[in-house]
């Protein structure tokens, strides 16, 4: 078995519209790849933190599991990037999600999505669990950046009707 740790500091990500840089903290422990403490950074919008992130082999399948917290530092830029109309915008500090991806067949399972997840108890923003509001099959059908923006607009429209 191979064990070790390597860190990649990436200052420029080409071909990725949302993020500018990354820090990939890769650990190998008993054949399991652990990506916890890795980050993706958008200098204008915020930072995505990967916790409990692992790539493992289960029943001859390569499975990536991750808990991800996207802390939003500039809501205006976030909403502009996704083209969310002003009436559908909410005060948004972060987006938390848990995913599992089968790398053999490209299937993604979204276990949980929460807007404004309480990290500390003093946050005054209402936490919104979107896990039952989002259809994973619709997400799988998204083929490009434009479709993602349209889908995001639909989700924020639904959220605005809930509040």
Predicted regions and their residues:
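Small-residue helix/turn framework positions
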Residues: 1-162
């Amino acid at each position: 078995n191979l064990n070790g740790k390597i860190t990649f500091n990436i200052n420029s990500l080409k071909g990725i519209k949302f993020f500018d840089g990354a820090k990939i903290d890769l650990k190998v422990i008993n054949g399991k790849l652990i990506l916890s403490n890795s980050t993706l950074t958008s200098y204008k919008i915020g930072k995505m933190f990967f916790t409990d992130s692992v790539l493992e082999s289960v029943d001859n399948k390569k499975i990536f599991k991750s808990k991800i917290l996207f802390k939003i530092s500039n809501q205006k830029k976030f909403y502009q990037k996704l083209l969310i109309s002003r009436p559908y915008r909410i005060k948004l500090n972060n987006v938390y999600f848990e995913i599992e991806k089968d790398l053999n067949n490209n299937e993604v399972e979204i276990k949980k999505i929460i807007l404004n997840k309480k990290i500390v108890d003093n946050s005054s923003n209402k936490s919104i669990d979107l896990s039952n509001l989002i259809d994973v099959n619709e997400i799988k059908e998204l083929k490009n950046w434009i479709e993602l923006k349209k889908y995001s607009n639909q989700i924020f429209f639904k959220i605005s009707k809930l509040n």
